[in-house]
């Protein structure tokens, strides 16, 4: 009854559940996804037609579903006997893939509604026949492997009875009473044919009896799918190859390589449908994942340009394309598709199509996918040739470096030139190498121009450069006007010119050495004296005696200027000579200056004390006295003028007249 109520819900409520999925609770999200898959299987729109056939367990049931709401083409669902638990886990992984595709198609519903209605009419003619042939081989193989009895409870489908009284013409879903069966996708054994169908198609959802045990099944599925996929890949002979990020960008940027991935798979699926149907279920699931990844990663503009396929092109949303382009640099080719499938199954479906589809990996199943390896080999050969050139150039420069003193700098410049050449050949060096190549190119041009000058000018240039820039390095300002990068041809010509002018450089070296010797002699002849040397000590030196505190003659006076046996000794005594010669005007002047300084200091101290005392007095005494009313009246009474009488007024008038 609960399933019947879910089946009666309208289509918009079913797709509304996708937006209501919570990102925090992964367990409730998986249960809800299983319920959505049941609703997608059991809801019958008004435009759907179902063929009901009552057959035995070994017979196949073909369900042709046309969903105009989603804009998908005919849908195929085969009812087969219960299989082993490993097949059920593989089908669960495929069901998760179908749910991811359903989310993508739901996002693109409003934009591509008009295109998908016209494309679904064209796809009705050729698809059912091919799917019928695919189902014939896959059902027989799966029926032969029915050995596990416990899988019957896991794969049992709930019988559904669709009762719609309002519309009697609406078909009903099949009600299986004979034995429990499960819906297995016909597209699982034929993962290659998914490239022919529209990208909007989704696989029919599978239904299970116990959705609460999905976590346990997923944990077991992670181990079983990885082991089975590794064995199948070993038998099929797939080889793994780690490709760099640069090669993957080249691979996805070329449109012809895009066709090389899609067209051979179409031819294989159309020419040999029975052979693809006998592939194991795990391998088919892997190919289904690869086809989904290829449709998600490759630009859809190339698919829409092919008019013969009649498949509608789906332009991926902006966020999805941006995430794919940002993460393409980190995608590497892996040899185990089962690992990518297990990682995709383990993720919650509600995280969005961009994050879940980015976990898929790409396997190169055609020889065209290995095309970038040829260009890689050519790049490696070019790098080896450039390395050989560097080694030979280094040997030549070492031979030239031993001939003179200027050669080490030239060898360093040439080694920088070889580094710049390697950087231009590879094309992906850092900015430091570009700077070195620019500076080395300017140095090489300077050397080549100096060597190509006439013999009379070349020695002079070398002399100036060696004399001035002996202790200096090449200035970076000289390379500002030079180009930052040079082509291979220009560098080759420069190296050839340097090798030709090596003889002229060798002849210039002796002249350079002679010029250095001349300049060195000229520098040694120049005598530079210090200012202290030009200022001699005074003739009379006096020493202050600590005891007498007076000036006394020093030993320099008697030893340098006085005769050992002066005549004055016989006439004048030593005390008189000392008194006469002890007079020093400098000492008197210094004494006077010190007295003046002392007097100034005393005056300053007195002035500061006076200021301090006046400040204290001003603070102690009241500078303003507040008068009372009585004092004001007394002051007015005392200073009031006498009243003017008549007599006094007449006297004043008479005086004025």
Swiss-Prot record:
Acidic residues: compositionally biased ranges: 343-354
InterPro entries registered for this protein in UniProt: C19orf44-like, DUF4614
Disordered: annotated span: 142-216, 228-248, 291-312, 335-354, 399-522
Keywords: Phosphoprotein
Feature: compositional bias, Basic and acidic residues: 190-206, 485-495
Ranges of biased composition (kind: Low complexity): 437-451
Residue(s) carrying Phosphoserine: 114, 213
Pfam families with a match to the protein in the record: DUF4614
Coiled coil segments of this chain: none
Polar residues biased stretches: 143-169, 234-243, 301-312, 462-484, 499-513
Record-given protein name: Uncharacterized protein C19orf44
